[in-house]
């Protein structure tokens, strides 16, 4: 599957599902290789993105196992793959214990979900699915059963750790939220506000601690060092340097998520495409 080196990450929430096709056309025209659709979508929700484009890869970023039936997922996946071959990446995640009362042992639950996908009448191809894997054992499962991992809210150091754990030949595709604004105080305020919900989730804070940040860094809204690393701010050229840091750390593909622009983020996507793709 040709994800390309640079993609975008966004849910439909900022502009509404009815405009997904319009947004997808812009993403493809700008030269991005993939759109990772956030907001815990079902596979069927990606049809407008695929139908509006001819080469763009659509990816679930991510499908939540607690909210998804594996047999329905496999059937929807097979239907879209038949209609749009080579253009669908099934990103699967376990979510967070803070977000669901049904949260059980995450590794066991993910393994069971993959088993059900494989046993379905229309099994999903292992090389066209990936896991949102932060912890070492989940990364091991991603290596054994999927194409690799889609990381979220991580530093380049975590990308390096993931690459080391997965080894060569496996997908490492981190998301990178960013703020295109050269006013440092204003941009950092946007980045810090965005980061708050993630700093309240144990899976993310443990991953940040494992990649070299301290308890002080993750406390009280996040240190400037943490915020500036995980949610960089500045010009498109400055953001491109952070993208390159992930690529240098072993990422195959980085999906950028510009913050702070209402509706379809045309200006941000255009500026990032010029800086990252040319």
Regions found by a protein language model. Name each.
Residues 1-278:
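Active-site-adjacent structural elements that line small-molecule/cofactor binding pockets in enzymes
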